[in-house]
Structure formats: structure tokens, C-alpha cells
């Protein structure tokens, strides 16, 4: 073991709780990668990762929500089986899913910034339905924008080809996830103080 | 069969995690710089060499199976056109090479994942990224590894509970909501308990990490990384 002779620099209560939440949300997004639902328009199943990204932005806010998804990417790159289909490794961050993965922290930050109108969290009960849905639609645009750009760069496809190969089959399911996320936020079972 | 760390005494297991990370980044750089048939043949040898050095085999790639349909499908989509000549072989070939390049990146990543324990990865991250961001990343990554199996189990339990109560008859939106509410409320309560426990145990910004040191065995890996970086830079310049 390496020896440290400097004095202990304690992490504050609030930062420790936020760090724990960010890590747990990152793990939750990873666990959502294993939950598959039949896709309404395609034989390829959809997973709930994007729902996790929305929820991280909504419940943790732009700063810790974004940080949480950065942890998700770092853990996946270092071998935690958190990516699509339980895969892992740095290769995913530069492979064909690169655009989607790199968009997650940005999308969580965007969703959080719109829902909370800034970096400080506000009570979710005071957030109107249009704001909530608008934030997640914007988040979806960010995710698919990055994702399609990533497919174009990594697989040298044109924009239409990239949408056909990696976005068209999944986009309709995002509406379901947005509706589900609204249901989660309005649920009595969740009390995030 | 999921890809995860497998204890062993192979060459890759004995390397410093930082050398292995450098090799991966350099490999990605060189793979993007030389996406030509000849370049990819050489890189295939390097990638297979990396996997063999970690005592890995084809079964380690099985966890990437969800990526395969897109990689196979993409060249066909790229080649297809509306109207004559219907299929352009050269466009399909360009995308085919790009797809193959992604496969090689996954092979090299599999070698890292197989040969590196979590605490070494964490130490590498924390020693490479300075200050509090490094500690945040290091602790966070370790916690993700620790809590992923628990949260997966929570979600499975929720789904089973929903199914037992004939929840499968409900709409897809409602099922997604129920699973998400279950997972989220468990995750939040775990996070709050964990936060309290961390504070109670003097959670610090400067914990003691396992020692990492570059040794002689790292020299070939570092040389390989340097050579690949140089090749990529030469190509771009």
C-alpha cells in the first residue's frame, strides 16, 4: 500500500450524499440496460437506459445528473458491464454506439437545466407538465443528434443511412419512456428530499 | 457469459493498468488513422495478440453480440441506393471496413476488461486525474461496480412482482413506469444510507490507494502504445 502522510481531508455531508446518489444513478442506468421491453415498431427490443438518463437529470439536477452519467461512462470503460446488452470496455466509447454514450451526460445536464431552470434544484411538484415533457424531448433530440452523428463518423454513413441503421427503430419507443418518466416523477412512491 | 475480470497470471494481468489504457487509446487512434485493408490486417494481429496476452478467447466477445447486427447491417444500408445501380459496392466496402474497425476496438477492450481488477482500474483513474475530480471518479466507479448487481436484482424482483400480480396485462408505458419507480426508489434509499455510512466512516478526499508502478514488463506495452500513437500522428500530419 502507498503511504499518505498528509492529514485527512473529509468530504462534507452534502457532497458525500450527492456523490452516493450520482454513483447509484450511474449504476441504475447500467441496471436499466438489462431491462428490455418489446419495441412497438421493430423486432429489436428497447432498454430503459435513456429513461435512466432522463431521471438522473430530473432528480439530481444538471450538475450531479451530468456527473452521474460521466461516472457511468467511466465505469463502463473500465469494465463494469453497464453498456447495451451488458457489455463493457473502452471500445464502446469509440465504437458505433459512441455518439449515444457521449450524449448521455450532456442530455442529463440539459434535462436537469430545463426542469430546474438553472443549477439549483427546485421542488419537482412545482414543475409543470409542459416543462417536464419539453425537457425530455430536448434530451431525446440531444441523444439522437449525437447518436446519429456518431454513427455517421464511425461507420462512414450518410445522415439518412445512419438514421435507418441506428435511430429509426428506436425513436418511437422514446415517447413511451417520456410518458413513463412523467409517471415516475408524479408517483407518490418516490420522495427525493 | 458476460465479460468481466478473470484472475490470472498472463502478461496482460501483470501490466500496470495505465499501460493497458494507453495501448487502448493508441489502438483507437491508429485504427481510425489507417482504416485500409492493409492497415486493418496489421491491426487484427495486434488486437488478437492483445486478447491472447490476456488469456482471452472468442467467448469473451460474446457480450458484444448486441453490437453485431448494426455492424453487419451498416454496410448493406450504406451500399443500397434508390435507383440504378441499386447497390454501390465501394460505399458498402468503406462502411464494411469501418464496421470491422469497431470490432477490433471491442477485441482490445475485452483484453483490458479480462485482465484488470476493479481496484487497479480505480487506482489508475485516481492517479491519472488529479485532485478532487480524480477522487470523485475513482470512488464513483468503485461504487458503480459494487452496486450494479444489487440494483439489477432490485429490478428483477420488481419485474417478478409486477408479473405475479398480472402486471403483464398492463400497457407497456405502465410496466415501464412500475419498473422505473421500483428501481428508482430502491436506488434512492440505498444512496441515502450509503451517504450516511460514508460520512460516519470519515469519508475523505485523500484515501490510501494500492500502489501502482510501471515495471520492466510494462516497457513493451508502452513502446507499442508509443509506436501506434506515432503512426497515427504521421498519418494525420
Where are each of the predicted segments found?
Chain A
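Alpha-helical transmembrane segments and their helix-entry boundary regions
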Residues: 65-69, 101, 132, 162
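Small-polar-interrupted transmembrane alpha-helices in polytopic inner-membrane proteins
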Residues: 25-29, 65-80, 147
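Interfacial aromatic-anchored transmembrane helix boundaries in multi-pass membrane proteins
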Residues: 34-45, 73-107
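Hydrophobic transmembrane alpha-helices
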Residues: 2-66
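Short helix-perturbing small/polar motifs within transmembrane alpha-helices
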Residues: 2-8, 17-24, 31, 92, ...
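Membrane-water interface at transmembrane helix exits
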Residues: 33-37, 76, 111, 115-119, ...
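Alpha-helical transmembrane segments and their cytosolic interface
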Residues: 2-23, 161-193
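Interfacial helix-loop-helix junctions of multi-pass membrane proteins
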Residues: 80-86, 150-164
Amino acid at each position: 500500500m502507498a503511504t499518505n502522510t498528509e492529514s485527512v481531508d473529509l468530504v462534507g455531508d452534502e457532497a458525500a450524499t450527492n456523490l452516493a446518489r450520482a454513483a447509484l444513478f450511474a449504476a441504475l442506468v447500467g441496471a436499466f440496460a438489462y431491462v428490455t421491453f418489446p419495441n412497438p415498431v421493430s423486432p429489436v427490443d428497447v432498454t430503459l437506459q435513456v429513461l435512466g438518463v432522463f431521471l438522473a437529470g430530473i432528480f439530481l439536477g444538471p450538475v450531479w445528473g451530468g456527473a452521474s452519467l460521466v461516472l457511468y461512462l467511466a465505469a463502463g470503460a473500465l469494465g463494469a458491464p453497464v453498456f447495451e446488452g451488458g457489455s463493457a470496455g473502452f471500445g464502446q466509447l469509440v465504437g458505433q454506439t459512441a455518439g449515444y454514450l457521449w450524449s448521455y451526460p450532456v442530455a442529463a445536464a440539459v434535462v436537469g437545466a430545463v426542469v430546474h431552470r438553472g443549477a439549483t434544484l427546485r421542488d419537482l411538484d412545482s414543475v409543470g407538465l409542459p416543462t417536464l415533457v419539453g425537457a425530455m424531448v430536448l434530451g431525446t433530440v440531444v441523444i439522437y443528434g449525437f447518436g446519429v452523428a456518431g454513427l455517421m463518423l464511425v461507420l462512414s454513413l450518410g445522415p439518412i443511412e445512419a438514421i435507418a441503421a441506428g435511430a429509426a427503430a428506436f425513436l418511437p419507443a422514446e415517447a413511451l419512456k417520456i410518458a413513463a418518466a412523467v409517471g415516475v416523477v408524479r408517483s407518490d412512491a418516490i420522495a427525493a428530499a | 457469459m458476460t465479460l468481466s475480470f478473470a484472475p490470472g497470471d498472463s502478461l496482460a494481468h501483470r501490466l500496470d493498468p495505465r499501460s493497458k489504457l494507453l495501448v487502448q487509446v493508441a489502438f483507437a487512434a491508429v485504427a481510425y488513422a489507417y482504416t485500409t485493408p492493409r492497415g486493418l490486417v496489421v491491426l487484427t494481429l495486434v488486437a488478437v495478440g492483445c486478447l491472447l496476452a490476456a488469456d482471452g478467447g472468442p467467448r469473451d466477445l460474446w457480450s458484444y453480440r448486441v453490437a453485431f447486427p448494426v455492424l453487419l447491417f451498416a454496410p448493406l444500408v450504406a451500399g443500397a441506393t434508390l435507383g440504378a445501380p441499386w447497390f454501390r459496392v465501394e460505399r458498402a466496402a468503406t462502411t464494411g471496413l469501418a464496421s470491422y474497425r469497431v470490432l477490433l476496438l471491442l477485441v482490445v477492450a475485452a483484453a483490458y476488461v479480462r485482465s484488470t481488477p476493479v481496484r487497479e482500474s480505480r487506482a489508475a483513474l485516481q492517479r491519472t486525474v488529479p485532485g478532487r475530480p480524480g477522487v470523485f471518479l475513482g470512488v464513483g466507479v468503485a461504487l458503480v461496480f459494487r452496486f450494479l448487481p444489487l440494483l439489477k436484482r432490485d429490478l428483477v424482483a420488481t419485474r417478478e412482482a409486477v408479473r405475479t400480480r398480472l402486471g403483464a396485462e398492463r400497457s407497456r408505458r405502465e410496466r415501464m413506469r412500475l419498473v422505473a419507480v421500483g428501481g428508482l426508489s430502491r436506488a434512492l434509499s440505498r444512496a441515502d444510507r450509503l451517504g450516511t455510512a460514508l460520512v460516519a466512516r470519515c469519508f475523505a478526499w485523500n484515501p490510501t490507494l494500492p500502489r501502482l508502478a510501471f515495471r520492466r514488463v510494462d516497457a513493451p506495452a508502452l513502446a507499442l502504445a508509443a509506436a501506434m500513437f506515432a503512426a497515427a500522428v504521421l498519418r494525420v500530419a
